[in-house]
Amino acid sequence: MSATSSKETLGFQAEVKQLLQLMIHSLYSNKDIFLRELISNASDAADKLRFEALSDAALFENDPELKIRIAFDRDARTLTISDNGIGMSRQEVIDHIGTIAKSGTREFFSQLSGDQKKDAALIGQFGVGFYSAFIVADRVTLTTRRAGLTAEHGVRWESEGAGDYTLETVEKPQRGTEIVLHLREGEDEFLSDWKIKSVIRTYSDHITLPIVMKKTEWKDGVETPTDEDETVNKASALWARPKKDISDDEYNEFYKHVAHDFEPPLAWSHNRVEGKQEYISLLYVPSHAPFDLYDREKRHGIKLYVRRVFIMDDAEQLMPQYLRFVRGVIDSADLPLNVSREILQSSRDIDAIKNGSVKKVLGMLEDLAENQPEKYVEFWKEFGKVMKEGPGEDFANKEKIAGLLRFASTHTDTDAQVVSLKDYVGRMKEGQTAIYYITADSFAAAQHSPHLEIFRKKGIEVLLLSDRVDEWLTGNLHEFDGKPLKSVAKGGLDLGELEDEAEKTAQKEAEESMKPLVERIKAMLGERVKDVRVTHRLTDSPACLVTGEGDMSANLERLLKAAGQAAPTVKPTLEINPSHALVTRLDSESDEDRFKDWANLLFEQALLAEGGQLDDPASFVRRLNGLLAMLPG
């Protein structure tokens, strides 16, 4: 469209209408946030200009002093926030103001809870803070021009927050963005110098850009702006200040700025590293998970600066995938200003910064787990599943990550993941040499698995793993504190010193006496099983299925197939309980057809008990009904 195009009216994306209503009605009691959001956006625009100007200084247009200006007009009842940052082109206005990113809309609205505090957190998280202007304004006018375009390529966007907005091309000599809020009736407090400065100092003191207002003076009992500017905020990089000079409130507000979050963080770590590498890191652990936590392709949360100059958002090379929830800033004194993402991938300096930062985050989590366990429980509920990716990604810190993991177990027998491996080892029975676990596709399936029967009888604790990522975890974490991790559903069971001689003798006798039955069942089941043997892991169930020590677990096989991935079919071993009535009934069965039905029923119910699916459910039902019909009436 040409620079001289006339005004046009465009409709908001449907989701934007919903969002505007949410902003106006749900967040009113927390309305000061609109100013923080607009200032934060202006600060981001300045950061982007600084970065683009590294390769094209002409973008500064002889105006390199970046600032945010705030002004109010009592007569017109307007509040104006302007910046001389990067600005926007016409298409960028349509993309960023008229729509919300398509990928995020469904998740956004599915997560709205009606809880004002939680919904406010989502708004920041989805990067839609601009719309908070409508909390206090019934009309918003945005005028902008992108750096590098000529004055006639200015764009004016205006909306009353209903179903549509207007867009027109205007002259704008200065680059950057100006937002004029036409205040609603009853919002006169935002026409007060004191109120605006109070909000800025509360929420935006840490913004590195100067936030400028006209000084005011009192004349005849009326507060009147003068021609003299004053900077309202501290306008210095918070992370570069000494820790002792920064209050908890300042740390919290800075987090909300860098993370676009409305909730305070769970913990933070502020460090200045000197020596071979010189850098400052200010890293935060959020108090809640972002909506896209499990999308490994989505943005990371670390902003990279070089000597206070913003370089890039979402610098994925600075934090491994399993710590993708960490937010914050890293400011290097050594990297070149023209550093690119490609350079980051092969930079030893970046590797050193990453390694140091990971250690700080893990140390912060260790401190939380040890000194504030109730907070760590909250952390684990939000981020536990991604932490379980760690041992497979970060070999150097595997033991440290393992110490941070939490699980459900038979010790508590609830689905709360509160048991650490250190806790488990501390409770191991005398003579126990392994850490036992079971994986299943639900907590109930793990908790009630027949594989646990002998362990429950002997009081041996078993970890109950039911997260999808647990299969990945156990495939990469093989031991802790010198103790191997062993699945109770894999391989032969050898409890060693945990069984007495009488038990071992009884097992051998049962194996010997059941040999003919074992051979009959094996012949009858044929290709359905790898082997059949007598078990000593069952006390109440007639049978269970186990896989080989080096084989893929049945649960992992199901997960892969459900995800549409190729997975080898692993034949299980059927283990039978020699003391169970069904097994003794089978042993005495002389009719070959009935024996076949009993043997298949035994296998199929063992398959169901471990969460498996039957290839032919109708045959299972037919067999079961036939055998039930034979019972005495």
UniProtKB/Swiss-Prot annotation:
TM regions (residue ranges): none
Principal localisation: cytoplasm
GO MF annotation, one: unfolded protein binding
Xref: InterPro entries: HATPase_C_sf, Heat_shock_protein_90_CS, HSP90_C, Hsp90_fam, Hsp90_N, Ribosomal_Su5_D2-typ_SF
Gene3D superfamilies to which the protein is assigned, alphabetical: 3.30.230.80, 3.40.50.11260, Heat shock protein 90, C-terminal domain (1.20.120.790), Histidine kinase-like ATPase, C-terminal domain (3.30.565.10)
Keywords for the protein's UniProt record, in alphabetical order: ATP-binding, Chaperone, Cytoplasm, Nucleotide-binding, Stress response
Record-level GO cellular component terms: cytoplasm
Region annotated C, chain positions: 559-633
Sequence segments annotated as region (B): 342-558
CDD domains per record: HATPase_Hsp90-like
SUPFAM superfamilies: ATPase domain of HSP90 chaperone/DNA topoisomerase II/histidine kinase, HSP90 C-terminal domain, Ribosomal protein S5 domain 2-like
Compartment(s) of residence: Cytoplasm
Region (A): 1-341
UniProt keyword ATP-binding present: yes
Pfam families: HATPase_c_3, HSP90
Family: Belongs to the heat shock protein 90 family.
Function field: Molecular chaperone. Has ATPase activity.
Quaternary structure, from the entry: Homodimer.
Protein name per the record: Chaperone protein HtpG
Source organism of this protein record: Thiobacillus denitrificans (strain ATCC 25259 / T1)
